């Protein structure tokens, strides 16, 4: 049991490192936005989605939902703060119409999390019931966000080019999924297994596509659209790592 606990902790630590990398990977995108003083065609969608997921996991880690989950709050709180900084930069350099859209989405997300929190605390009265209820929402959103890379993978196949699918994030996607799947199997956890199983499959498919189309990719410089697509893929990758972390401290 001690060895299993150590193995789970090691897997969790590795997952945390990868998750932090994924949280920070959009930085080049926002450096570009800051230098140009405008958002151009970049979209706030992936960052808004990550804010919602992080907020749900922070709530999941609270003592009244899942006791002894301080690290859940820490890692997802960190991710939430990072994403809010990204959105603040995006908001500052956006035209008025896009500022309104971002603001309305953030308000909507706050209302949604508030409704989930209220229902959790009023309708469920045990930690197991509450953690299961909130965990289901977290897994649903993680699963939905794995749909995002499908458009990028489709573009890779159509263009026979991997310029829109950076190898580093594809590899991080795969490793992140594998680490948390291993963690989930050491002491079976369905929530972790579902989300990160999807992450493993998604990462594996991306790596296979990369191997197939790397040689047919034009050897030109990456453009800004690469960074935008990179951040879209990145948004859901960091989430599956966080879902695994949420279970590690509660074991």
Curated annotation (Swiss-Prot):
Higher taxonomy: Eukaryota, Viridiplantae, Streptophyta, Embryophyta, Tracheophyta
Residue stretches making up the MtN3/slv domain: 12-96, 133-216
GO biological process, one term: protein homooligomerization
Polar residues bias spans: 231-245
Location relative to the cell: Cell membrane
Described purpose of this protein according to its UniProt entry: Mediates both low-affinity uptake and efflux of sugar across the plasma membrane.
Induction notes from the record: Induced by the pathogenic bacteria P.syringae pv. tomato, and slightly induced by the powdery mildew fungus G.cichoracearum and the fungal pathogen B.cinerea.
Coiled-coil blocks: none
Main location class: membrane
Transmembrane segments: 13-33, 46-66, 73-93, 104-124, 133-153, 164-186, 191-213
Region Disordered: start-end pairs: 220-251
GO molecular function: sugar transmembrane transporter activity
Protein name: Bidirectional sugar transporter SWEET4
Positions on the Extracellular side per record topology: 1-12, 67-72, 125-132, 187-190
S-S bridge residues: none
Similarity field: Belongs to the SWEET sugar transporter family.
UniProt-annotated glycosylation sites, renumbered to this chain: 3
Membrane topology of the entry: Multi-pass membrane protein
Keyword annotations of the record: Cell membrane, Glycoprotein, Membrane, Repeat, Sugar transport, Transmembrane, Transmembrane helix, Transport
SUPFAM superfamilies: MFS general substrate transporter
Record text on subunit structure and interactions: Forms homooligomers and heterooligomers with SWEET8 and SWEET17.
CC annotations in GO: plasma membrane
Gene responsible for this protein: SWEET4
Residues in compartment: Cytoplasmic: 34-45, 94-103, 154-163, 214-251
């Amino acid at each position: 049991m001690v060895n299993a606990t150590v193995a789970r902790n090691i897997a969790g630590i590795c997952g945390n490192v990868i998750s932090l990398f994924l949280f920070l990977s959009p930085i080049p995108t926002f450096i570009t936005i800051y230098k140009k003083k405008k958002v151009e065609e970049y979209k706030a969608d992936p960052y808004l989605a990550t804010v919602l997921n992080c907020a749900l996991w922070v709530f999941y880690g609270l003592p009244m939902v899942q006791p002894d989950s301080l690290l859940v709050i820490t890692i997802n709180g960190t991710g939430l703060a990072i994403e809010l900084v990204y959105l603040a930069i995006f908001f500052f350099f956006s035209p008025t119409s896009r500022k309104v859209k971002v603001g309305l989405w953030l308000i909507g997300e706050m209302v949604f999390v508030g409704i989930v929190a209220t229902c959790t605390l009023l309708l469920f009265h045990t930690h197991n019931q509450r953690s299961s209820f909130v965990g289901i929402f977290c897994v649903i959103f993680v699963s939905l966000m794995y749909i995002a890379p499908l458009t990028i993978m489709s573009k890779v196949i159509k263009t026979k080019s991997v310029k829109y699918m950076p190898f580093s994030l594809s590899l991080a996607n795969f490793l992140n999924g594998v680490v948390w799947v291993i963690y989930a199997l050491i002491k079976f956890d369905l929530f972790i297994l579902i989300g990160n199983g999807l992450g493993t499959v998604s990462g594996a498919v991306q790596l296979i596509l990369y191997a197939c189309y790397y040689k047919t990719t034009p050897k030109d410089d990456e453009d800004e659209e690469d960074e935008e697509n990179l951040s879209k893929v990145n948004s859901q990758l960091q989430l599956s790592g966080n879902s695994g972390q949420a279970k590690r401290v509660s074991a």
